[in-house]
């Protein structure tokens, strides 16, 4: 395991625990000498996790579209920032550069990144670990819905084995190195 892709919101959310967990995850990535790949923004949980990883000494690569670079204010202090033409190119590049994906809380963009990675896994395109970092139960309703989808016959049981959930940064990363 060398490089972790982090999906995260461009907002901080209302709970302080979201920011604290993003910061802890960034520090843990650096502490374990992983590099980090993420969406390249400087705001919200994205910016917090990147800043913490950088502060801890990690190499951090941002991948952002030209349009989002202007909207989200691309992070200017990264080890490297790649600007790509489309959202699809952004997700494909982040997946290509990483050995695992961790999804922090976020909105529609974060969900879409997570679900596309999950779909790629189901189709055999992406075979690396995909982890939901379930801060304060943020993803608990999603887990319930996923189980319901399995019960209703729309999702194979094997999909549940692909994504794991952890409640603390050190547990999340310990899982990846075991």
Language model regions located:
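A cross-family phosphate/adenosyl-ligand binding-site feature
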Residues: 1-97, 136-164
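Active-site-adjacent beta-strand anchor residues
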Residues: 39, 104, 132, 166
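Hydrophobic alpha-helical segments, chiefly the membrane-spanning helices
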Residues: 177-178
């Amino acid at each position: 395991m060398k490089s972790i892709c982090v999906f995260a919101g461009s907002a901080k959310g209302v709970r302080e625990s979201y920011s604290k967990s993003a910061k802890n995850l960034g520090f843990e990535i650096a502490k374990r000498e992983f590099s980090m790949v993420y969406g390249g923004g400087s705001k919200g949980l994205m910016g917090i996790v990147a800043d913490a990883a950088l502060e801890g000494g990690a190499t951090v690569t941002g991948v952002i579209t030209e349009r989002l670079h202007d909207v989200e204010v691309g992070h200017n202090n990264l080890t490297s920032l790649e600007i790509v033409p489309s959202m699809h190119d952004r997700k494909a590049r982040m997946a290509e550069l990483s050995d695992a994906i961790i999804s922090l809380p976020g909105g529609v963009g974060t969900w879409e990144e997570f679900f596309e990675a999950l779909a790629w896994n189901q189709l055999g395109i992406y075979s690396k670990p995909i982890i939901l970092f379930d801060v304060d139960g943020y993803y608990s309703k999603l887990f319930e819905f996923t189980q319901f989808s399995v019960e209703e016959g729309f999702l194979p049981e094997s999909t549940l084995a692909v994504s794991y959930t952890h409640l603390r940064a050190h547990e999340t990363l310990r899982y990846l190195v075991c």
